[in-house]
């Protein structure tokens, strides 16, 4: 039996397949997941599991270099936005119109993880990165400019 971390087999498998720049969407209970998306449905009941728990567990296992959320999040759900900035402090943050998060980003995502969250604008995209110190830390390796501050 696995000792810790994410125990859900489907989610664990999806995380293991993600590569640099791949997008993972972690969404609330009401998100309209596209029919052809790789849907990982964790929702059991209202706020079970909640968005922050799922994002936190994923963050413990995944290198995240970018976070995208609806442009409404900073003004309409500032507590969530603040939490995201704390939890993903090394990531670049961007916003998109809410309709794009529901449409274009959902189609772009390698997987969509549905939580039980009843969280306004609780649909968060995570762009995968690389562990820069481990990736570029070898002797004689020239570190690309965009990773220099992370090595």
Swiss-Prot record:
The active site is at residue 20. Pathway: Carbohydrate metabolism; D-ribose degradation; D-ribose 5-phosphate from beta-D-ribopyranose: step 1/2. Its EC number is 5.4.99.62. Keywords: Carbohydrate metabolism, Cytoplasm, Isomerase. The keyword Cytoplasm applies. It comes from the Bacteria. GO terms for biological process: D-ribose catabolic process. GO terms for cellular component: cytosol. It is found in: Cytoplasm. InterPro entries: D-ribose_pyranase, RbsD-like_sf, RbsD_FucU. It catalyses: beta-D-ribopyranose = beta-D-ribofuranose. GO terms for molecular function: D-ribose pyranase activity; intramolecular lyase activity; monosaccharide binding. Substrate binds at residues 28, 98, 121-123. Homodecamer. Belongs to the RbsD / FucU family. RbsD subfamily. HAMAP family: D_rib_pyranase (MF_01661). PANTHER family: D-RIBOSE PYRANASE (PTHR37831:SF1). Catalyzes the interconversion of beta-pyran and beta-furan forms of D-ribose. This is D-ribose pyranase 1. It comes from Streptomyces griseus subsp. griseus (strain JCM 4626 / CBS 651.72 / NBRC 13350 / KCC S-0626 / ISP 5235).
């Amino acid at each position: 039996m696995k000792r810790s971390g994410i125990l859900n087999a489907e989610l664990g498998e999806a995380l293991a397949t993600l590569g640099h720049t791949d997008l993972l969407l972690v969404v609330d209970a009401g998100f309209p997941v596209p029919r052809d998306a790789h849907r990982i449905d964790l929702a059991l009941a209202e706020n079970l599991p909640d968005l922050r728990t799922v994002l936190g567990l994923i963050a413990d296992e995944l290198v995240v270099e970018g976070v995208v959320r609806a442009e409404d999040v900073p003004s309409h759900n500032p507590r969530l936005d603040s939490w995201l900035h704390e939890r993903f402090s090394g990531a670049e943050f961007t916003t998109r119109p809410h309709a794009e998060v529901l449409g274009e980003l959902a189609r772009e995502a390698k997987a969509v993880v549905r939580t039980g969250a009843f969280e306004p604008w609780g649909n968060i995209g995570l762009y995968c990165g690389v562990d820069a110190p481990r990736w570029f830390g070898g002797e004689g390796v020239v570190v690309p400019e965009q990773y220099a501050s992370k090595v």
